[in-house]
């Protein structure tokens, strides 16, 4: 689970340093020292520099001619990435020290940490990770030097790495995989760890760098877990053991990160799904296929019903499409050319057989649909269309099926069966910009209604190896999306090559309560599907024209959105979404009947309310319903019954005693009807107490 990078106190995570000059024949480190910049010990210590071409360089780098460089501090994204990469090398050295038979895979920095893959005889245990951390701390304390060395040839590299089969494979790598830090530069290089006193080589690794100067410049790190992983992420390859860790510019930053990890674990929707009886993943059904329990079903229904209402108000028309279709549809759309790996295998049906079992008439391949868009194209094409009907906005809660590898399936956020709140808008080119503007506003407003308000945008452009249509069409679509994104006043971040095969997209990136970023809504502009499906409308001048198609999923999928909201609210859903909105808790059994009357009054207003009639003591009932995240707990004892009142109890342990029944009912109904996303507390709920 990803948690946000935390800048050191006083730092914003950016690099405020001004460029400095490195004279020819001088190390970057010397220039840093001459400029009076910190080299170690501080969160803003300089770890590498960026040259005029944007390439990161070690501090030992010596330019042939005078060069202008930008110092990169430890508390920047690039600085942390270098520290983590160097820490991954220290991990690999520790593994080969303690497990000499271990073979090295790859060890890149990743968001908030790093990993390294190893071929070992047995999986790593928690005790192994402790021993490795201890050895790593020794290596850091030794202050080993990172020394860059250029191989004279690939043959020399293969010879030196003969006992490292995975590294030998990388010598000839041309994949451009960003996780492969070993190769990819202009030269084939190794980084040796040197004894700081004797400068003897202690250990080394095939690597393009850059690295920090010495292991002593690794301020704080921790190993977090281990798991199995296929070599290069391909399940056809060998299964290796992967160790994950994290490293930061200071102990304080590491401690903050660990606290966030622990809080993320407490909020894990998979854990809360069990504790709150929301959903499950039965083995009998299969990996990545969720079933929603009654309480989860209520939350899901509320999410969908509110979305339906807002789509109706925005002029969408509701459609439905089947779950399977003939293969030809996905040949037409291009999915079988460009997306087959993400689809389940075909089912051959409708074959006819002779009495002897031989095939008289071959069947046809049918596929579970991975997307709804081809079927919506057929709905548009089902009859003649006029410009007067455009924009035509089609909407469906359509369940699709995608073959996700078992290693990436994760709770509700990465599943194999998912229900998309899928819309496809068909419009004229003249309507395109206005439609995109209003669509983006609609998306942001609806997400805000669910309590998600911290956004930025990402513009995904053409993958040059995986697209349909002409370069000119892609360029026009990309420019239009960029223009609309820029007008939104939100940050627009480029994502080169990240588009689907049929068109560029803007995705809305949302930050949750922990500051983690989730890709949420996508808006995709498509000139290609209308061409492939022969979609036309009659224009005002009587000519036949192609519509523009806009693909849009607001939640991404209901399942994923459900999981994200569960973690955002730590299971304490806003009262309007909560499966149980209020619960009556009697002080004693003789108060049950009175609370039943209160509950009946709330139910008449549509409130989901229960009365706890269990044999548990009142204190235990309060603990139980607090843990179940019920927004409103209503207590009643003798004084409450006599006064026709209740006492409010909230999850933060605040309490309002002696609230007249009518006032209590009105306060709850008002809170829910206003769709308040805040958790109700004694301070927030405005109600007059009778005491």
Curated annotation (Swiss-Prot):
<keyword id="KW-0862">Zinc</keyword>
<comment type="subunit">
    <text>Homodimer.</text>
</comment>
<dbReference type="Pfam" id="PF03129">
    <property type="entry name" value="HGTP_anticodon"/>
</dbReference>
<keyword id="KW-0030">Aminoacyl-tRNA synthetase</keyword>
<keyword id="KW-0067">ATP-binding</keyword>
<keyword id="KW-0436">Ligase</keyword>
<keyword id="KW-0547">Nucleotide-binding</keyword>
<dbReference type="Pfam" id="PF00587">
    <property type="entry name" value="tRNA-synt_2b"/>
</dbReference>
<protein>
    <recommendedName>
        <fullName>Threonine--tRNA ligase</fullName>
        <ecNumber>6.1.1.3</ecNumber>
    </recommendedName>
</protein>
<dbReference type="InterPro" id="IPR036621">
    <property type="entry name" value="Anticodon-bd_dom_sf"/>
</dbReference>
<feature type="domain" description="TGS">
    <location>
        <begin position="1"/>
        <end position="73"/>
    </location>
</feature>
<feature type="binding site">
    <location>
        <position position="551"/>
    </location>
    <ligand>
        <name>Zn(2+)</name>
    </ligand>
</feature>
<dbReference type="InterPro" id="IPR004154">
    <property type="entry name" value="Anticodon-bd"/>
</dbReference>
<keyword id="KW-0963">Cytoplasm</keyword>
<dbReference type="GO" id="GO:0046872">
    <property type="term" value="F:metal ion binding"/>
</dbReference>
<dbReference type="InterPro" id="IPR033728">
    <property type="entry name" value="ThrRS_core"/>
</dbReference>
<comment type="similarity">
    <text>Belongs to the class-II aminoacyl-tRNA synthetase family.</text>
</comment>
<dbReference type="GO" id="GO:0000049">
    <property type="term" value="F:tRNA binding"/>
</dbReference>
<dbReference type="InterPro" id="IPR012947">
    <property type="entry name" value="tRNA_SAD"/>
</dbReference>
<keyword id="KW-0694">RNA-binding</keyword>
<dbReference type="InterPro" id="IPR018163">
    <property type="entry name" value="Thr/Ala-tRNA-synth_IIc_edit"/>
</dbReference>
<keyword id="KW-0820">tRNA-binding</keyword>
<dbReference type="InterPro" id="IPR047246">
    <property type="entry name" value="ThrRS_anticodon"/>
</dbReference>
<comment type="function">
    <text>Catalyzes the attachment of threonine to tRNA(Thr) in a two-step reaction: L-threonine is first activated by ATP to form Thr-AMP and then transferred to the acceptor end of tRNA(Thr). Also edits incorrectly charged L-seryl-tRNA(Thr).</text>
</comment>
<feature type="region of interest" description="Disordered">
    <location>
        <begin position="1"/>
        <end position="22"/>
    </location>
</feature>
<dbReference type="GO" id="GO:0005737">
    <property type="term" value="C:cytoplasm"/>
</dbReference>
<dbReference type="GO" id="GO:0004829">
    <property type="term" value="F:threonine-tRNA ligase activity"/>
</dbReference>
<dbReference type="Pfam" id="PF07973">
    <property type="entry name" value="tRNA_SAD"/>
</dbReference>
<feature type="region of interest" description="Catalytic">
    <location>
        <begin position="268"/>
        <end position="574"/>
    </location>
</feature>
<dbReference type="InterPro" id="IPR006195">
    <property type="entry name" value="aa-tRNA-synth_II"/>
</dbReference>
<keyword id="KW-0648">Protein biosynthesis</keyword>
<dbReference type="InterPro" id="IPR004095">
    <property type="entry name" value="TGS"/>
</dbReference>
<feature type="binding site">
    <location>
        <position position="373"/>
    </location>
    <ligand>
        <name>Zn(2+)</name>
    </ligand>
</feature>
<dbReference type="InterPro" id="IPR002320">
    <property type="entry name" value="Thr-tRNA-ligase_IIa"/>
</dbReference>
<dbReference type="GO" id="GO:0006435">
    <property type="term" value="P:threonyl-tRNA aminoacylation"/>
</dbReference>
<dbReference type="InterPro" id="IPR002314">
    <property type="entry name" value="aa-tRNA-synt_IIb"/>
</dbReference>
<keyword id="KW-0479">Metal-binding</keyword>
<dbReference type="InterPro" id="IPR045864">
    <property type="entry name" value="aa-tRNA-synth_II/BPL/LPL"/>
</dbReference>
<dbReference type="GO" id="GO:0005524">
    <property type="term" value="F:ATP binding"/>
</dbReference>
<feature type="binding site">
    <location>
        <position position="424"/>
    </location>
    <ligand>
        <name>Zn(2+)</name>
    </ligand>
</feature>
């Amino acid at each position: 689970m990803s948690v946000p990078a935390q800048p050191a106190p006083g730092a914003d995570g950016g690099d405020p340093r001004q460029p400095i000059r490195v004279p020819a024949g001088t190390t970057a480190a010397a220039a840093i020292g001459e400029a009076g910049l910190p080299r170690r010990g501080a969160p803003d210590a300089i770890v590498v520099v960026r040259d005029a071409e944007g390439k990161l360089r070690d501090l030992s780098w010596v330019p042939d001619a005078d060069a202008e460089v930008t110092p990169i501090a430890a508390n920047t994204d690039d600085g942390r990435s270098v520290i983590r990469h160097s820490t991954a090398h220290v991990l690999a050295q520790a593994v080969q020290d303690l497990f000499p038979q271990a073979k090295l895979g790859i060890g890149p920095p990743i968001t908030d940490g790093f990993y390294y893959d190893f071929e070992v005889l047995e999986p790593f245990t928690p005790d192994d990770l402790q021993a490795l951390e201890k050895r790593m701390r020794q290596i850091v304390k030794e202050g080993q030097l990172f020394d860059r060395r250029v191989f004279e040839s690939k043959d020399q590299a293969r010879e030196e790495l003969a006992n490292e089969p995975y590294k030998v494979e990388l010598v000839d790598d041309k994949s451009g995989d960003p996780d492969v830090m070993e190769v990819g530069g202009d030269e084939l290089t190794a980084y040796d760890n040197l004894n700081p006193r004797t400068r003897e080589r202690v250990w080394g690794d095939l690597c393009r760098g850059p690295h920090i100067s010495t292991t002593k410049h690794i301020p704080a790190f921790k190993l977090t877990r281990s798991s199995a992983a296929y070599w290069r992420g391909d399940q056809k390859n060998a299964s290796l053991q992967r160790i994950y860790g994290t490293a930061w510019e200071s102990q304080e930053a590491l401690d903050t990160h660990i606290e966030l990890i622990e809080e993320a674990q407490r909020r894990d929707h998979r854990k809360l799904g069990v504790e709150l009886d929301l959903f499950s993943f039965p083995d009998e059904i299969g990996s990545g296929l969720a079933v929603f329990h009654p309480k989860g079903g209520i939350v899901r229904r509320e999410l969908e019903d509110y979305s339906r209402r807002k789509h109706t108000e925005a002029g969408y028309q509701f459609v439905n499409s089947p779950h399977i279709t003939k293969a030809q549809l996905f040949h037409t759309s291009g999915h079988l050319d460009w997306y087959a790996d993400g689809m389940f295998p075909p089912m051959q049906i409708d074959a006819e057989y002779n009495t002897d079992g031989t095939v008289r008439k071959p069947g046809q391949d049918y596929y579970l649909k991975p997307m709804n868009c081809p079927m919506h194209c057929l709905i548009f094409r089902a009859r003649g269309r006029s410009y007067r009907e455009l924009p035509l906005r089609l909407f469906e809660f359509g369940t699709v099926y995608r073959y996700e590898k078992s290693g990436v399936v994760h709770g509700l956020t990465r599943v194999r069966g998912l229900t998309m709140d899928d819309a496809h808008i068909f419009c004229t080119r003249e309507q395109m910009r206005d439609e995109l503007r209003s669509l983006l506003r609609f998306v942001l407003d609806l997400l805000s209604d669910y309590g998600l308000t911290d956004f930025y945008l990402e513009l995904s452009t053409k993958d040059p190896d995986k697209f349909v249509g002409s370069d000119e069409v892609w360029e026009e679509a990309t420019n239009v999306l960029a223009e609309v994104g820029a007008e939104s006043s939100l940050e627009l971040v480029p994502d080169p090559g990240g588009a689907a095969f049929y068109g560029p997209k803007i995705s809305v990136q949302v930050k949750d309560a922990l500051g983690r970023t989730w890709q949420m809504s996508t808006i995709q502009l498509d000139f290609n599907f209308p061409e492939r499906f022969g979609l036309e409308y009659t224009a005002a001048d009587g000519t036949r024209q192609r519509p523009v198609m806009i693909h849009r999923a607001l939640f991404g999928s209901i399942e994923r959105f459900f999981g994200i909201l569960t973690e955002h609210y730590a299971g304490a859903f806003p009262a309007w979404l909560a499966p149980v909105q209020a619960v009556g808790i009697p002080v004693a059994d003789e108060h049950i009947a009175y609370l039943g009357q209160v509950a009946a009054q709330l139910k008449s207003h549509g409130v989901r309310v229960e009365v706890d009639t269990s044999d548990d003591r009142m204190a235990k009932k309060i603990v139980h319903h607090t843990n179940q995240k019920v927004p409103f707990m209503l207590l009643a004892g003798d004084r409450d019954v006599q006064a026709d009142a209740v006492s409010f109890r909230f999850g933060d342990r605040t309490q309002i005693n002696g609230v007249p029944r009518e006032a209590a009912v009105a306060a709850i109904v008002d809170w829910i009807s206003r769709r308040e996303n805040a958790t109700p507390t004694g301070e927030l709920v405005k109600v007059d107490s009778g005491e």
